[in-house]
């Protein structure tokens, strides 16, 4: 069902009436109120010198986001476009392109619109630098790992994107103890936020002869699945990926790099 057909059907239902009243009230808010983000063309949009300052802070890893689909806009039947569509059948190719996502919105709920710039983060310090820059300049900030967000949060126009694809390290531990806890040592794996489950299973199960609870789609990002709860093929036996989490290194909205576990920053941890 297309979006307009869905809206037409909903318009016949009583539930829509108070919703429309609320939307009308929101639309009536005078300009200048609310928490509108700075966008390209606004007077407060960062200058080229300010963007260059961010580029230097992240070691040159600030990139302008361009759509890989541009060749098809310029020459829909050209060889470059045909080659691109062959590549689009490969989900790993899509994952390696900052300007693409693995999913699109249901019933036209959202469409792929590229961010203006992306920080190709390689460390928590890079992430913190992007968070600080977005906060200081009141920019919309989005994060993309595997690019599978069904809610459209892997991309946003007029935004700064934190791209974690390069933070894909995987390290196995025979006896891991979360920081500042007296927990018993457990076999565990430390996984970067840009890793996808296919790579994790290869390291943990194929090479390490162990099991980690994850999802069924091999190209889904680890961080996104865990933050979404993490239901997987063996959840009836071993629970969700989120319930298996022992500790996380996080960057909070103030740009601070912190550890979150059951003892340290427990308010940021869901165990």
Predicted regions, residues:
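N-terminal accessory segments
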Residues: 2-239, 244, 258-261, 268-269
